[in-house]
Amino acid sequence: EVPAGTTVLEAARIAKVNIPTLCYLKDINATANCRLCVVDCGGRALQAACVLPVTPNMVVKTNTPAVREARKLNLELILSNHEKKCLSCVRSQNCELQKLCLDLGVESGDRFAGAQNEYEPDMSSASIVRNNNKCILCRRCVGACANVQKVGVIGPVRRGFKTAIESPWGMKLAEMACINCGQCITACPVGALTETDGTKAVWKALGDSAKHVVVQPAP
């Protein structure tokens, strides 16, 4: 038994039944965008478990051939507009999208090959790098910014194929009211939002014999 209002996804997690997700973050983001959590409830169409409330005597099938195929199809559609440079991505081997591809047997993202959006990475911020070429439009960063930090400076813009997660009027990160908290980075399941990498600057400083370098570890 679960409390009234519990979703099928949360009930499944309580019961230790695995249902894959990409866009869901408990109490932060439940928008059913990725459609990877679809389940069979006996109706004409598969339902998104993350927004589907549990009802009495409900029968839910989470791992039928039709469910697995639908999840795989939706994952391939997500990959069709995703930059596939996994070897050079800082999230390689720590990427939720990559892990789901392995779990669902998706070997390439070429099934729906076609036009792709191309964006210039935003490196204007002192602490955050935004690369929308890797964005999967899950909106987890939007939920974290609005619901955790209560700042709400990013959101979906435009429609259809041109939809992107950006700041208002196309402003760069350094130009808007971003407080550089990093909650969006923590929420991002892929490499679309990452921390600014200061590795090269550190190596350069260490190699400068005229510079006295002090290291301070963080707790």
Predicted regions and their residues:
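Short, contiguous acidic and Ser/Thr-rich linear segments
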Residues: E1-T6
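A basic, amphipathic helix-loop patch mediating RNA/tRNA/ribosome contacts
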Residues: V8-G42
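Fe-S ferredoxin-like electron-transfer domains
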Residues: R35-N180, T186, L193-Q216
